């Protein structure tokens, strides 16, 4: 039993004396790790910022385009006279010369494309 205790104390003493690291070495190691962590954080932050800017650009692009659900205002309906220089026909209509009806009124009407 005494040999076990003696061996344990001997191993414990060796581990304590040889296992102690230099305090400056520990500080240097911690500084390296924190600097690496900071550089990784900066890299991740820049990457996230780029992705957010791309997403924002896509969202702004969607809002800048005309919405298909929005109603056109002040457009001219089908079979209504229009001006050839300033056609304000509704979407899906085009300002053309009439074929049969309306030839004696105005020269252009809104027709389906």
Swiss-Prot record:
Disulfide bonds: 75-90, 82-95, 89-110
GO CC annotation, single: extracellular region
Species of origin: Cyriopagopus hainanus
Tissue-by-tissue expression: Expressed by the venom gland.
UniProt KW keywords: Disulfide bond, Ion channel impairing toxin, Knottin, Secreted, Signal, Toxin
The protein, known as: U11-theraphotoxin-Hhn1m
Lineage: superkingdom: Eukaryota
Source species taxonomy: Eukaryota, Metazoa, Ecdysozoa, Arthropoda, Chelicerata
InterPro entries: Toxin_22
Keyword flag Signal: yes
């Amino acid at each position: 039993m005494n040999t076990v205790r003696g061996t344990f104390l001997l191993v414990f003493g060796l581990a304590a004396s040889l296992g102690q690291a230099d305090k400056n070495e520990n500080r240097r190691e911690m500084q390296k790790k924190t600097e690496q962590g900071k550089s990784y954080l900066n890299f991740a932050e820049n990457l996230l910022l780029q992705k957010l800017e791309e997403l924002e650009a896509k969202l702004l692009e969607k809002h800048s385009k005309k919405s298909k659900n929005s109603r056109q205002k002040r457009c001219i309906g089908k079979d209504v006279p229009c001006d050839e220089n300033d056609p304000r026909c509704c979407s899906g209509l085009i300002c053309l010369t009439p074929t049969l009806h309306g030839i004696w009124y105005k020269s252009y009407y809104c027709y389906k494309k």
